[in-house]
Amino acid sequence: MLLLWRRKTVGLICLFSILLTIYLYVSMYPEDNERVWNSGNADIQRKHEKLNNGGQGRHDFDDDEGAEKDEEDAVEKQNIAAPPLPKSFTTFPDRSKEIEIDTDLLGKINGKAEDDLQVEGYKKYQFNGLLSDRIGSRRKIKDSRNARCSSLTYSDSLPAASIVVCYFNESPSVLIRMVNSIFDRTKPEHLHEILLVDDSSEWSNATDEAIKYREKHIIQWEKVKFLKTDKNEGLIRAKIFGARRANGEVLVFLDSHCEVNEEWLPPLLDQIKQNRRRVVCPIIDIIDAITMKYVESPVCTGGVNWAMTFKWDYPHRSYFEDPMNYVNPLKSPTMAGGLFAIDKEYFFEIGSYDEGMDVWGAENVEISVRIWTCGGELLIMPCSRVGHIFRRQRPYGIKTDSMGKNSVRLARVWLDEYLENFFEARPNYRTFTDYGDLTSRISLRRNLQCKPFKWYLENIYPELLPDNTPNQLNNQILVAGKKYLIKMANGTHCLSAENSQGRIANGNRVEMRKCNHMERMQQWKYSSTNELRPMGSSRMCLDSLRGISVILCHNQGAHQMWQVSNAGKLYSRSVNKCATGSNDVSALSTLKFCSLANSFQFVEL
């Protein structure tokens, strides 16, 4: 009985304590006594959308309407006033080593003061500034590399890099954590210096706190140097400002809201050591602007549309049939622009950035085209990964249409006879004249003996070529049940199924052989389901899944369905490419974008 009485007494005391706590809390915040304070990330999302006034900023650069709207918003939006250092930064955890961080737990909001701090962070940075401050000076992130990356080796004598980081009105915690991620995941011999370039921010919080942090951690931060532009130059000219003051053999440009991953730098430096004309980029992983979680990105390459805006492209699924392609260098027609490495001397040899461009926008596409057409290479390294906070929109406004002006400069200098394609994509810039003097950039192109833009389209990015998809298909050229020689127009060679002693094996290639109407391997029967079957084996079909080959017929159409355009192009809709060939002895038939493919004559037998 005594034990039971004690348990009841303890229970009543606990209940009384809880009720007293609730009473005191409600008394302190009577105006909010019906509000739920323990909001998680769903509540954060709603606040973020509210702060953006329902606006949808761009994540991808291939949204033309979004690009134009972003430009208009940039012109109309005014710079926000300089606020004081967030109170959340006064408890910024300074850690000596990386630890696992539970961002879900840290993201909880308790009380009106924290709620106000969170709202303030979104207004200032367009990401969760409060959560960033709580995460602290360093954290452990997921190693997002493919497992094969850890077995790769690199040269023992790699060049040392100057890392150039430009920022404007940045969060102190994000900037400090980025620098620490570099020190924690970079070998000292690979790092010459880190240049933090303050592009005349409206408030000096990030620089001031980073300087204080360096004073406390002078041994580790010894290689950090602080630079400041005389006036706000914009990202493009701020990068040039930093590059001119760098002393390392290689320049590595990083955005200020990044965290580098394990062994991120050797894959970049190794390619430049092999060929100083190589410009190399990491895979850009995502740091979620709301949850601050580190999210792995797939392997992809940079592309562009006729509006000259950047977009991401994904390699064809057949590319990864070789598992090593998850780690091999990948040629990229363009780069996103914020994160890349380049030999310092080569950067200035090819003209650095176009200093006639303003602030940011299109400079990444311009330098990409220049690299490829003027003798360089642009690669993406899957074993180098850097996380980047993708914000919905910039946290500050600009008073000029920099994206539009810069795109016009790019188009008028580099597009040659394809300039009209740009104006068709962006007709509002056809009469735009305030793009500045182009004389020096045209002279640079001539002095570097750069190839024409047509070469870039045909050899680097044929996806952009006009007429890649046949506009008109002719259903009268091939008739079901008939047999044909498929002969190159104005040529002497025909499509011929590869065989061994007259037998065609599943997966055999298709060769270009001198035409012989008696040769059964050159006779192709067209079926009612648009298949082309070699008479040497009626069970096989011409297939486009892995290039041009002969595969067992599956009667499903898809890669075994062929049509002919009015121009005589043999077209596979499933891969949106056409068969092509040559008159070279024993050449193989391949797939190309239709604008680059040969025309054929279909000779009925």
UniProtKB/Swiss-Prot annotation:
Residue segments, region Catalytic subdomain A: 158-271
PROSITE patterns in alphabetical order: RICIN_B_LECTIN (PS50231)
SMART domains, per database record: RICIN (SM00458)
Residues bound to Mn(2+): 255, 257, 388
UniProt-annotated stretches for the region Catalytic subdomain B: 329-391
Subcellular location: Golgi apparatus membrane
Catalytic reaction equation(s): L-seryl-[protein] + UDP-N-acetyl-alpha-D-galactosamine = a 3-O-[N-acetyl-alpha-D-galactosaminyl]-L-seryl-[protein] + UDP + H(+); L-threonyl-[protein] + UDP-N-acetyl-alpha-D-galactosamine = a 3-O-[N-acetyl-alpha-D-galactosaminyl]-L-threonyl-[protein] + UDP + H(+)
GO-annotated cellular components: Golgi apparatus; Golgi membrane
All copies of domain Ricin B-type lectin, residue ranges: 481-605
EC number: 2.4.1.41
Glycosylation sites: 205, 490
Gene3D superfamilies associated with the record: 2.80.10.50, Spore Coat Polysaccharide Biosynthesis Protein SpsA, Chain A
Transmembrane segments: 12-29
Protein name: Putative polypeptide N-acetylgalactosaminyltransferase 11
Species the sequence originates in: Caenorhabditis elegans
Taxonomic path: Eukaryota, Metazoa, Ecdysozoa, Nematoda, Chromadorea
